[in-house]
Structures are given as structure tokens and as C-alpha cells.
């Protein structure tokens, strides 16, 4: 191990550390960071060399953050990245600084939005917030209105997580939806992602995603928002149902074919009792 450590350059060590951090399961960033910190044993090197990994993790995970003085959380995403560590809260029309390591928002300031698309963005946000409140107990959504390649574009992001470290599992749902505002009809493009980590007496991860495409009729802002939510709800319901059914099937067939739930005797072995019997027998023989 010492020989291998001597062969690795600082650049290579940081590259490996960054990979660990970027692939940290949801809700386990701090644990992975602390482990990597111990392995690297160089805080300055880790902070300077792996800073991009901290940022990439938060962007990929749609990390929610609360801004002091404002009621609703906002998501950290690439669509709200203003550069130089600043991000956009489109609902409150503010920019703020975000510390990717501490996951803290500071220095909120007024920020002018894309006025030409703001009425569309607001309509979609209102409809999406109602949908998220109904379907996601811990859900957060952020809706952006941007001009991309000359086209007015709506981007809607949803994040919901459950972190149950005491029960040895953590999970996160993310979905991203886009459509351009064009006459008559437009195409909605979405991607749905689920990541769950279960680590009691083992280490199992579910990482799944699905791409979605559908047509959306564009009329006025409010009606278009309603039709958009119908597409989102149908696709996300179908995806969640498919995931649940698939894993129920695997539990009933594949997993059972791989391993018996009970030994051939149909009785679970109490290893603690066996150990105590063995110790007692050895003491008698002594």
C-alpha cells in the first residue's frame, strides 16, 4: 500500500478522490467526504483540487437550499448557475452565493429575470408547485425561463428525498422537464432519475433513469401549464409504477432463485446462541 501511495501523484490522488465524491449516494456526501479526507490526509489538496467535484455533486443531485429571509427552498442546478459561485432563485428574483461544501446560501441580491418569458414561467411554476405538493411529501421544485438558441424555453426541475440513516437507507428522486414556447404545439423533453442506497448488512444501490418525449399544445399561459402538468404527472406515475412492479417481480422470482430465504431446515440459525454454546463447551473442556 505504501509503495502504491508513493507512485501516485497529487493530481492522481485528487482525481480518485473527486470520483468518490461525485458518486456519493444521496444524503451521504459528508460521510464520503470525511472518508476521502482521511485517505488523502491533505486538506489543502482536497479543497483546492476537488472543489469542482463538490460543485458537480450539488448540480447533479439538484441539492435544495434554504435562503435566509425567504420561505421556499430553491434547487441548485446548472440552469440557475450564474458563475463565480452564484445561483439564481427565479421565484424570488434574487441571486445568491452558494458554498458547495457547507451547502449554505448567503448574500441574496435582487436579480432581473427574463421579462419576456416571466408570465409563462410563473404560470408553470404555480401549477408545478401544486403538483409537487400533492405527490411529493418532501418535494422541492424550481422553474426557469431562459432564452436558449434564440428560443424562449421553460425548464422545470423537481427534487424529493428521504434520508433514513438510522434505518440504513437514503434515496432521492429527480426530474427535469423542458419545452420551448412555440405556436400551436411543442415538444416536451424530460428525464426522470431515481437513486436509492440500502446498506444494512450489505450494500445495494438502485440507480435508474428514463427519458421522456411528448407533444404539448401551446395556447395561453395558464392552459399550457395545466396541459404540461398532465404530461408530467402521467409520465412520473407510469415510471414509479413500473419501478415498483419490476422490483416486486424480482423479489418474487429472481432474488428467490438466487438464494433461499431460509436454510433447508426451514429454521433460522441463531449465531449468538451457537457462539455461546461453543464458548461454554470450550470452558467445560478446559
From Swiss-Prot:
Disulfide bonds: none annotated. Keywords: Acetylation, Actin capping, Actin-binding, Phosphoprotein. GO terms for biological process: actin cytoskeleton organization; barbed-end actin filament capping. GO terms for cellular component: cortical cytoskeleton; F-actin capping protein complex. One of its GO terms (molecular function) is actin filament binding. The keyword Acetylation applies. The modification Phosphoserine is found at residue 9. The modification N-acetylalanine is found at residue 2. InterPro entries: CapZ_alpha, CapZ_alpha/beta, CapZ_alpha/beta_2, CapZ_alpha_1, F-actin_cap_asu_CS. Belongs to the F-actin-capping protein alpha subunit family. Component of the F-actin capping complex, composed of a heterodimer of an alpha and a beta subunit. Component of the WASH complex, composed of F-actin-capping protein subunit alpha (CAPZA1, CAPZA2 or CAPZA3), F-actin-capping protein subunit beta (CAPZB), WASHC1, WASHC2, WASHC3, WASHC4 and WASHC5. Interacts with RCSD1/CAPZIP. Directly interacts with CRACD; this interaction decreases binding to actin. F-actin-capping proteins bind in a Ca(2+)-independent manner to the fast growing ends of actin filaments (barbed end) thereby blocking the exchange of subunits at these ends. Unlike other capping proteins (such as gelsolin and severin), these proteins do not sever actin filaments. This is F-actin-capping protein subunit alpha-2. It comes from Bos taurus (Bovine). The lineage of its organism: Eukaryota, Metazoa, Chordata, Craniata, Vertebrata. The gene is CAPZA2.
Amino acid at each position: 500500500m505504501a509503495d502504491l501511495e508513493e507512485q501516485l501523484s497529487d493530481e492522481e490522488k485528487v482525481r480518485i478522490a473527486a470520483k468518490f465524491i461525485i458518486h456519493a449516494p444521496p444524503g451521504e456526501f459528508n460521510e464520503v467526504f470525511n472518508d476521502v479526507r482521511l485517505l488523502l490526509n491533505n486538506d489543502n489538496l482536497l479543497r483546492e483540487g476537488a472543489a469542482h467535484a463538490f460543485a458537480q455533486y450539488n448540480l447533479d443531485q439538484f441539492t435544495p437550499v434554504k435562503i435566509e429571509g425567504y420561505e421556499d427552498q430553491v434547487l441548485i442546478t446548472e440552469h440557475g448557475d450564474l458563475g463565480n459561485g452564484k445561483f439564481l432563485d427565479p421565484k424570488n428574483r434574487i441571486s445568491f452565493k452558494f458554498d458547495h461544501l457547507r451547502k449554505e446560501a448567503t448574500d441574496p441580491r435582487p436579480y432581473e429575470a427574463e421579462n419576456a418569458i416571466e408570465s409563462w414561467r410563473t404560470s408553470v411554476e404555480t401549477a408545478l408547485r401544486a403538483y409537487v405538493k400533492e405527490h411529493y411529501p418532501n418535494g422541492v421544485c424550481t422553474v426557469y425561463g431562459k432564452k436558449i438558441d434564440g428560443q424562449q424555453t421553460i425548464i422545470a426541475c423537481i427534487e424529493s428525498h428521504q434520508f433514513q440513516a438510522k434505518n440504513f437507507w437514503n434515496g432521492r428522486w429527480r426530474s427535469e422537464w423542458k419545452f420551448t414556447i412555440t405556436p400551436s404545439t411543442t415538444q416536451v423533453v424530460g428525464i426522470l432519475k431515481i437513486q436509492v442506497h440500502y446498506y444494512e448488512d450489505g450494500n445495494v444501490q438502485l440507480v435508474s433513469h428514463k427519458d421522456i418525449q411528448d407533444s404539448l399544445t401551446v395556447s395561453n399561459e395558464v392552459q399550457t401549464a395545466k396541459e404540461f402538468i398532465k404530461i408530467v404527472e402521467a409520465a412520473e406515475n407510469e415510471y414509479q409504477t413500473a419501478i415498483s412492479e419490476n422490483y416486486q417481480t424480482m423479489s418474487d422470482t429472481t432474488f428467490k432463485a438466487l438464494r433461499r430465504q431460509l436454510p433447508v431446515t426451514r429454521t433460522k440459525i441463531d449465531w449468538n446462541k451457537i457462539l455461546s454454546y461453543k464458548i461454554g463447551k470450550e470452558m467445560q473442556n478446559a
